[in-house]
Amino acid sequence: MFIKEITVMNFENYFPLWNDLNTAQKKLISDNLITRDVKKGTIIHNGNLDCTGLLLVKSGQLRTYILSDEGREITLYRLFDMDMCLLSASCIMRSIQFEVTIEAEKDTDLWIIPAEIYKGIMKESAPVANYTNELMATRFSDVMWLIEQIMWKSLDKRVASFLLEETSIEGTNELKITHETIANHLGSHREVITRMLRYFQGEGLVKLSRGKITILDSKRLETLQRS
């Protein structure tokens, strides 16, 4: 019981709508809240096979992606500390048919509000319903931005942008990442990414080694992604 109380107290500090809930709604969430510690590489939500519920990241990093008919992956967006994901509970919104997979990119601690619990509260609470709509709109804005990148931006610019994003996330210019991983994020093929990275290396932008990419000239990468 004591551990459960600590879990709920921690959740209160992360869930932005806690103070907008009434006593019964708070109890409903507290009684049904799921805590999960997942290892890097764990699939948390798997397309239309699951209706996991609302995810709230306490610490760690998640990746939300879709699969093409050919099995190629492309990252839609990532989730970091205090981020929430609704696409893992899209089954509660009949107008949304969006099959995504959610994977832990790092060891992650998270909370899950079961889909039916969240759906019930959303029907009762205008603040929760409004916030849900705003969050969903933000995520679809992210997806539309991604589509624009794929349609109108050349691969060299997208790779440069991805490498700069990774250095910002990891806080280092030495990235422990494979060419296959980059291909999965960008919806490309490993061989294509390898050729592009070798071109970058020839231009003095990066240095390649086994399982690692070192950024040598971030300013030129920034210029490339903006050009």
What is the role of each PLM region?
Residues 77-133:
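Cyclic-nucleotide recognition modules
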Residues 44-49:
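Short phosphate-coordinating micro-motif centered on Lys-Gly-acidic
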Residues 155, 164-227:
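Phosphate-/nucleic-acid-contacting segments
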Residues 69-76:
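Short alpha-helix-to-loop micro-motif enriched in aromatics/charged/Gly
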Residues 41, 52-65, 80-82:
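Glycine- and acidic-residue-biased ligand/ion/polar-headgroup-sensing regions
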Residues 1-39, 79, 84, 89-93:
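Cyclic nucleotide-binding regulatory module and flanking cytosolic helices
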Residues 105-106, 123-188:
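Polybasic "coupling" helices that flank or enter modular domains
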